[in-house]
Amino acid sequence: MKSYHKELWLNIEKRMDFINITPEVEQAVIESGIKEGLCLVNAMHITASVFINDDEQGLHRDYKSWLEELAPHEPLSRYDHNLTGEDNGDAHHKRQIMGREVVVAITKGNLHFGTWEQIFYGEFDGMRNKRVLVKIIGF
């Protein structure tokens, strides 16, 4: 069994946004040389997420609206976490809702997706460098 890892660095210019990182993950699979295995894609920050869904802008707008309803950024006083001097209590909740990582099967050297599935990085406290880990294991 082989393993391979790669780190993706992102700096999203908005507080909240979703970026399709499927091409970067596909490139990591090619670089790994692994034909059959698993690919873990993991947000390495507690205010960011990795998830799988359709790359459809209306859906992304719906997610942003829904997340803001569930965990609004303001008022900042809503979150005890913000009493520490932070202003990102909402971002921690949004990450918890959207999840930390995904695992995708690798079959014949390709990510094995269902119809329309793509891998997204979700940012909830942007405007700084953040890291995504891609860890691939297999044969």
How would you name each of these model-derived features?
Residues 1-139:
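Active-site histidine-anchored catalytic micro-motif
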